[in-house]
Amino acid sequence: MNRESENRRRNQRNVQRTNAVMGACAVALLAAQAASPAHAGAYEQARRIYERLDGVQPSATVLNTMANDILSQPGQAGLLAAAVVATDPHTGANFYDATLKEFINPWTNRNQSAFVPFNDYTATVIGMIRDDIPFNTVLSANILYTVNAPGLPAASPANNDHYATAEANGVDFATALQQTTQTVAYGTPSQGVAGVWTTHTGAAAYFVLGTNRAQFRFTMLNYLCHDMQLVMDNTRPTDRIRQDVARSPGGDSRVFLDNCAGCHSGMDPMAQAFAYYDFNSTTNEMVYTPGQVVPKYVKNPQNFPWGFVTPNDDWANRWRTGPNADLGWDQSLPGSGEGAASLGQELENTTAFANCQVVKVFQTVCMRTPTSSADQATVASIQALFTQSNYDLKQVFQQSAAACAGT
C-alpha cells in the first residue's frame, strides 16, 4: 500500500512538472511572438497612454485596439488614434469620472482642493470637454450640464444635491451628463449668465462676502496661470480703484503706490463687471441685480472717500498696454464692455489663457513641468493646434498623451 501511494505521488509530481514546463514553454512562445520591438513598443505605448489619461489599466480588448492603432498608423497619427480610444466615453470612462474630475475640482474652491463633492461647475467643464465645446467660452457661455439618471433631485441654484447624489449613486458621468442652460435650469436671466462664474459652485466660492475681487483673482490663477503678484503694474492710472483701498496704509502712501496700486489699478476696472452679483448665504443662492450695484462695491468708503464709486457694471482693461500686454489680448475685441460675460470673453481669448490650459494638461498627463526646450516646443505646438481647432481641450489631452507616450 505504501509503495503504491509513493508511486502515485511520484506520478503526480511528474505530471505537475511536465505541465509546468509545457506552460512555461507556451508563455515563452507567446512572448517571443509578441516581443518584436514594434509590437512590444506599441503595447507599452498604448498602456502608458491609457494609464496617463484614465488613471487605470486598460482591459485586454481596449489595449489591443489601441496597440493596433499604433501599429497600423506609424508615428504621431497612431498615438493620437490610441489616445482617442482612451478618451472615448465608452472605452475610457475613467477619463471623465476620475481624471477630469480631479483636474477641474481645484478650480471650484478657494482652497484649491481636488477632494470636493461633485458639483455643477465641475460637471459643466467635464461636459464641455466631452462634447468638444470651444473652451474659450467657459467664462461666458450660457451653459450648464446636469445628470440624466434616475433617482436624483432636480438641479437647483441653491445646492449641489443633484450632483452629489449622482456621485454617491455611482453614476457614469462619461455618458450621463446632458447639456442645458443656466437660464433653463436655474432661472438666471441670460444677460446675467457668464459660464462657470455663475454656476452655483462658482458663485458660492467667489461671490460670497468680500468685494468680488476674489472671482477675478482666482480666474487669473486658474485660467491664465498668473496670480496677482505676476501682473502687478504700477504704471496704470489709479482713478478706478475703489474707496475701500486705503491710499496711505499705516500712514505711508509709498505702500499704496509701490504695492496696492500695482494690482488694483488693473483689477478694479475689470472686476467692475461683477458689480451686480452677490451670494446670499441664507438662501444659498447667487443674487443678480441688473442695473443695481451690490452694496459690497461701496463698502468701507471711509478708507478713501475720494476713491472710485462704482456706478454700473461697465469694465475696462487697462492691461492692454504696459507689461501685461504680454498676456496676449485679442485685438479683435474692444477691451471694454458691460457685464461678466463680455469680461469672460476678454480673458478667455488671451494667449495666456490658451497657454495655461495646455501647460496644466501637459503637467497632468506627462507628470512633469514642461521646462526643457523639447517640452516647451511640444507645448507651443499643442497650443497652436488648440487655438486652431476651436479650443478643443479634449484634443489637448490626447496630444499631450501622444507626445509623452514614450516617456
Name every feature range the model reports, one short phrase each:
Residues 272-275:
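Histidine-centered nuclease catalytic patch
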Residues 34-42:
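Boundary at the C-terminal end of the N-terminal hydrophobic targeting segment
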Residues 22-32:
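Bacterial N-terminal signal peptides
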Residues 202-212, 246-255, 265, 280-370, ...:
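Electron-transfer interface patches adjacent to heme c in soluble/periplasmic c-type cytochromes
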Residues 1-17:
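N-terminal secretory signal peptides that target proteins for export/translocation
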Residues 79-270, 348, 352, 362-365, ...:
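Extended surface/linker regions that mediate inter-domain or inter-protein docking
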Residues 42-93, 97-100, 277-329, 336, ...:
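Substrate/cofactor-recognition hotspot
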